């Protein structure tokens, strides 16, 4: 199937190119992409791949166009959010924790199917694709049917980021930290993940503090009831829970210092591989540190729940999103880095 796709190659400008999708296998579908979020993981992967040509994108939303022969539960014409890939059969998948799938790295980050076959070609040559089981910086994506969550009649640009970034922020609060009404949560970083985490916690009656240096990213959480600070060095009360979206060692150290005894720190940010910790403080204050992938979420369960919260006015996801044409990936990334947008979303038709 011929599609238009955004091809990335190291530091070179992205380009919109003609590409060829492989035919769907029995457990795959082709989704006509209507919107796709830009996530920090796309940028990290682009840097990691160096000069290797790649079609990235892993927060796709669109309409199912073709079904593999064994696909059930989906129909042509269904609007779906395409989330991360998982095998469905390992211990973690069966336990409802597909983010920790035994095959997660191969399925989401190898650039090919599990058997090593490519899913997308440019100028006749295979390129890095099947990113998070989709590679949705394109007008259509070949996706694992298991990754597709039907969402009904909702705005694609609003729900597309639920495939990863928004899912991670909300899931970290609801599934991992689980603060109770009246607890105090510190969210470090007010990007897409942090903002949704803050909004989710506020909807649960939790007191929220957001630490974010960019003024524009502090505005919405503050209007929704959060206390906002520009820096962790500003005076603030102790907290029961912390969500760090930055991965910075200095932020993690400050988070641990601010936690009340028996408090919990959840980590969702990609940072340096090593961080120094005061083991004595962890032990004597009963502190817990918890890693978190994809919000410990089962997308098929949490995505519909978050959409219902949005529709009830509890999660103003639309106010986080700025849209761009598909070809303007680099401008969207530049705007995000400059603090001009919280969550850029690309529109293949716009």
Task: Set out the residue ranges of the language-model regions.
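Glycine-rich phosphate-binding loop and adjacent beta-alpha segment
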Residues: 249-314, 348-350
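C-terminal hydrophobic helical "lid"/dimerization subdomain
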Residues: 1-3, 253, 300-350
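Conserved beta-strand positions in the Rossmann-like core of class I SAM-dependent methyltransferases
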Residues: 65, 209, 266
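Cysteine-cluster motifs in flexible loop/terminal segments that predominantly coordinate metals
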Residues: 84-146
